[in-house]
């Protein structure tokens, strides 16, 4: 939501005076995109996979209305805003001498699942392709066969030393493979 993105921004400001340069939507679900209105208001670019953008265009207003039903006070100021930058397979940029590879490794948890791979640190910000300390949720648009195939052929071969899962604490590959 707008207020959650604003609170996150305050946390960022508490540890650095550097500006936010880019916001990456990990997929098209509400928890990933309902804060876009805050970042867009600040003029910050928002990146998402093209399938996540389609998901927001197709279902964003319904997702926002559902959020308002259970969390009305935290929905104030929230609007459905799609990412202004899209990618299909990979988006690469360097910031502060660090190379970031924004990846869509394949279908998994939901439309447009996105990962951030930082090769020099062997760090994967996995998004919702990886869970830790909880059961994987299966939704109507989840392709479990695709998820397993994407994991085996694209995610696991990267062999990240560190993984920040979509849900759960930072961990490693053997731990997320349990879930």
Residue ranges and their predicted role:
Residues 19-21, 97, 136:
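Short, basic, glycine/proline-bearing loop/turn elements
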Residues 3-6, 10-85, 89-92, 111:
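Active-site HxH/HxHxD metal-binding segment of metal-dependent hydrolases
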Residues 1-2, 92, 99-179:
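Metallo-beta-lactamase
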């Amino acid at each position: 939501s707008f207020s959650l993105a604003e609170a996150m921004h305050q946390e960022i400001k508490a540890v650095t005076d550097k500006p936010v340069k880019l916001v990456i939507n990990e997929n098209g679900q509400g928890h990933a995109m309902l804060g876009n209105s805050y970042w867009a208001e600040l003029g910050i670019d928002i990146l998402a996979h093209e399938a996540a953008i389609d998901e927001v265009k197709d279902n964003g207003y319904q997702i926002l209305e559902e959020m308002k039903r259970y969390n009305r006070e935290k929905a104030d100021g929230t609007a459905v805003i799609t990412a202004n930058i899209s990618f299909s397979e990979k988006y690469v940029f360097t910031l502060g001498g660090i190379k970031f590879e924004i990846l869509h490794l394949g279908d998994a948890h939901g439309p447009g699942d996105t990962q951030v791979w930082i090769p020099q640190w062997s760090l994967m910000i996995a998004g919702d392709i990886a869970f830790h300390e909880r059961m994987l949720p299966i939704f109507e648009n989840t392709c479990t066969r695709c998820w397993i195939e994407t994991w085996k052929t694209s995610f696991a071969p990267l062999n990240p030393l560190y993984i920040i899962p979509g849900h759960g604490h930072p961990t490693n590959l053997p731990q997320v493979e349990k879930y």
